[in-house]
Amino acid sequence: MSEEDTSKLRILSVGSNAISAFISWRLSESKACHTTLIWRNRCESVLSEGIRIRSSVFGSTKWKPDVVAPTVEQLAMNSEPFDYIFVCLKILPSVYNLDTAIKEVVTPGHTCIVLNTTGIVGAEKELQHAFPNNPVLSFVLPDQFAQRGPLQFEHTTFAADSAKSVIYVGLTEEEDDVPDSVQDAMIETLTLTLEAGGVSCDFLSKIQKKQWETGVGHMCFYPLSIINDEPNLALMYRLKSFAKVIDGLMDEAFSIAQAQGCEFEPEKLDVLKRHIVNRMLATPRPSYPYQDYIAHRPLEVAVLLGYPVEIAKELGVSVPRMETLLALFDAKNKRNLTVRAGTPQSSPNFNPAMRRSPVGAASRSPSRSTIGISNRIGSVDDLLNTRQFTSSPIGGSMPKGPNSIYKIPSASMVNLSSPLVTSPSGLNPTGRPSRFGGRVRGNPLTMNKAGSVSDLLSTSTNMASSDALETASMIGVPSAMPPNSFDMLTLTQRRNRRNNQSSSPPAPSDRRYTMGARRPVQTRGMTDSVIPILEDPMSTLYDTSRYPTRNSKPATPKASRPPSIASTVHRRMD
């Protein structure tokens, strides 16, 4: 190591996430730090290619740390101690102890430990008990981070002045074993170094208030989102029942904060609650806890609800809602870990047989063909639950809540190869769900977003009731079709078929007349009935029959477009 490096502050950042990379990047930009980054996966890529960061404050860059290591154990043999260790790890007491993760690189009486407590309350006690001779600081970074790809992160600031990023550094409680002079020197040095890196650093003697401001939204929204399998926080908060529960949880959280010594002005508390709700509803979805839930990884139960409930018990604050939610959240986490990773959890009322299309049908199952396309889906489970595909009981109907977004089923959610069901019970013999037969939005004469021809033709009053044989031509059922049955062809295919009824049948290689690239079954002595097409009344204005052809005389025009102003002026001039 050169003399220049020995004069720099030795910084170690532990954590393979955006906050860890952002802090190390800004400290290295101060030109006063030698940065070491612990990156568990893709360690060689970080060292060779770097990390791409796009910031709304500092612009876009590709940054490489001075040293990269996959584990802390590889740095234990270093002769030079670290001055600051930024701990940006997930806090999972049921999986590992936070102090053991950094124990080998902490020098007693020298290293200052800086813990990321953004949205976390009460996590510093473990480090303070494990390292009594080392100062333990906490920092809160309210900015928003999002991962856009492998080793690619985006940073957006929420400060009042969007041209700067603010980080709050402070103490939770005074440490008796650390001299005040040493503690003040470490805080001042860190503050000046962050300022040199372009980050505004505010020191707070009591940082719990900022921790509660950033953590109340997490502990009120994320557990409910996971328990209800709903990643869309805005959709969940739109329901009055959930909004009432969330408001009650926020009241209990702020009562704990006030009992802990954090002062909130009563007239500004409602404004703060609205700000927290709006910020949570604006977060990208799915949230990071929900991503862990989908991947069957351990959830931060202690961070979101465990530590706040412990503080409430110590202070004698009654929090029945948080205690109930903690019990449900912990049970959900344990059940999620027992499920093998990669195995989807089906809804208890969902029958996988309902997803199958009729035998020989060409279209895919709607649960696979519409994921990520329809904007009417709140989550994957919404696509598979009873609101979409579970058939209603005999003689009954499927209940819908007053605030349900599925009041009007979308035509895009219908399996085009499934036959319509007209039985009184609403079910066909195979128990498949019936297609939506209600009203179709829009003008039926200009409908261009219908899910199928049957959806468009269902608006006709002279339409005969169809049955399960209406798709016989496509799925290969031979001739025994009633007169009212028809093929599920598009409007253009029906028009071509009607005009070419007297012509010879298509060649075997001709695939234009079938929806699923299959020729219709040719019948002898019988012609399938064709339902009249709903012609567009506006098409007569632009009829091309008035133009002359090679072997015929020009027909009398029925109607034409009105002459333009320019043509009228030229005629007058002539």
UniProtKB/Swiss-Prot annotation:
PTM-bearing positions, type Phosphoserine: S392
Any one annotated GO CC term: cell division site
Role noted for this protein: Has a role in meiosis.
Cross-referenced SUPFAM superfamilies: 6-phosphogluconate dehydrogenase C-terminal domain-like (SSF48179)
Pfam family, one: ApbA_C
Annotated region (Disordered), positions in chain: 339-374, 422-451, 495-574
Primary subcellular site in the record, as a coarse category: cytoplasm
Keywords recorded for this protein, A-Z: Cytoplasm, Meiosis, Phosphoprotein
Record GO biological process: meiotic cell cycle
Protein name from the UniProt record: Meiotically up-regulated gene 72 protein
Entry's localization field: Cytoplasm
Polar residues composition bias: residue spans: 364-374, 541-554
Annotated organism of origin: Schizosaccharomyces pombe (strain 972 / ATCC 24843)
PANTHER family: MEIOTICALLY UP-REGULATED GENE 72 PROTEIN, PROBABLE 2-DEHYDROPANTOATE 2-REDUCTASE
Modified residues (Phosphothreonine): T343
